């Protein structure tokens, strides 16, 4: 993670900042107001558009901690990409396409004291196609805690096997819909810190490119409805799916 001093240095890079409209969902529970800070960079090495969520709640300390965590990760991607772009350009006598590095985000849930936000990274460094990765942050905005999937479930519960079975069932359905999906997915089990986001009454489990399927399959997502897991959720997290 970057220190405050490092972060201040990072922002000395020339860029243009725009303010986009605030994304806000009305609800009776605590919500976050979310603004967007946009960094653009276009030179002989790189084309880059970086959209950073700026999260605002009444508790300024919690807001700062959340923003530091997310912003530092995004800025590391941006700075690393600029270095890679220069190396990429210098290594080739002729560059057909510029290096591309973009970041955007989707707010998946902003209600019931939970903010679930998906940061979408994209990088192109030549070749047949670019590479993209999604990083979800699931935050209890009452206390600023970043939730991992195991945080949601009662200790000792068999949440992994329940989710694994549901994913296998969904893969079987994909194969029934299209025989070409047979043999595409090589799924064994979710991980201890499995990637996921929260949306409506669902936990959406997802996998990186190549994790369980080839590039052409994209980022596989599997929707786990609360009805499948309600009996093993911790009491304090049952309310987020109401």
Go through each PLM region and give its residues:
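Compositionally biased intrinsically disordered regions enriched in Thr/Gly
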Residues: 1-242
